Regions:
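Outer-membrane beta-barrel strand-turn architecture
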Residues: 81-85, 124-128, 173-175, 220
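Repeated loop/turn-to-beta-strand initiation elements of outer-membrane beta-barrel proteins
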Residues: 86-89, 130-133, 171, 175-181
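Predominantly the C-terminal beta-signal and adjacent terminal strand-loop region
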Residues: 154-155, 160-220
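Short glycine/proline- and aromatic-enriched beta-strand/turn motifs that initiate or cap beta-hairpins
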Residues: 21-80, 133, 140-146, 151, ...
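Transmembrane beta-strands of outer-membrane beta-barrel pores
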Residues: 52-58, 95-99, 126-128, 139-143, ...
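Outer-membrane beta-barrel architecture
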Residues: 76-78, 119-123, 168-170, 215-217
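Outer-membrane beta-barrel translocator domains and adjoining extracellular loop/strand segments
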Residues: 58-64, 101-107, 145-152, 191-198
Length: 220
């Protein structure tokens, strides 16, 4: 959790520096912004959005466990440094909340998942940014799952690992609105557990996930 807080503090610091640079640019020339005609060669872009996420399990180390994801809700804050007309570096913070229907030894479990993630993507923008092709990594800052069995709460474990590959395409449907489809593939296994009781631990197993995200962002 401490690492996640550090990432958030760093992101806020970048935002404040960026806004401060904009305010200074209104009165003094900014040596870090190259003007090309009336358009800045380097500029920042901000956005907020929502979307849906489906998580698939490519592999499960135990045949005794069955996992089926439910559609998750996503909210995100987006930030990009745009260089010229065609290139950008994109980042942000993503919050996801969803669920998994699990079964182990004939018993069903309703697992609730919560995730915080940070994408780091390179973006190629075509046709005046109407189409945005992007790829890079998506970092899992914090990921947890848990379930209630009787009156006891138990931890399911990590759903999204730290390192994930990401690729996507965004389309501008309005001047300030972008719809994006993104695929995320985990590079690490998640460590999970089911069937724990007050008397002892349950079955330990690993999973490898992939995700499909569809979202809409409003640019500011």
């Amino acid at each position: 959790m401490a690492t996640f807080v550090q990432h958030i503090v760093a992101l806020v610091a970048v935002a404040l520096l960026s806004m401060g640079g904009r305010a200074m640019a209104q009165e003094y020339p900014n040596p870090f912004v190259v003007e090309q005609g009336n358009e800045s060669l380097v500029r920042t872009e901000w956005g907020v959005g929502v979307g849906g996420v489906y998580t698939g399990f490519g592999s499960i180390s135990s045949d005794a466990v069955t996992l089926n994801s439910r559609l998750a809700f996503q909210g995100h804050l987006d930030m990009a440094v745009v260089v010229g007309r065609y290139f950008a570096v994109e980042s942000g913070v993503i919050y996801e909340r969803g669920g998994i229907d699990a079964e182990y030894r004939g018993k069903r479990y309703d697992i609730t998942t919560t995730r915080f993630e940070m994408p780091l993507l390179l973006s190629l923008r075509l046709w005046d940014s109407m189409v945005r092709l992007k790829g890079g990594v998506q970092l899992g800052l914090a990921s947890s799952g848990g379930y209630l069995d009787g009156k006891e709460n138990y931890m399911f474990g990590t759903v999204t690992p730290t390192w994930n590959l990401a690729a996507g395409v965004g389309v501008s449907v309005m001047p300030n609105m972008v719809v994006e489809l993104r695929y995320i593939h985990a590079l690490q296994d998640g460590v999970n557990q089911l069937g724990a009781t007050v008397k002892g631990a349950g079955l330990d197993f690993t999973t490898r996930t992939h995700k499909v995200m569809l979202g809409v962002s409003l640019l500011m």
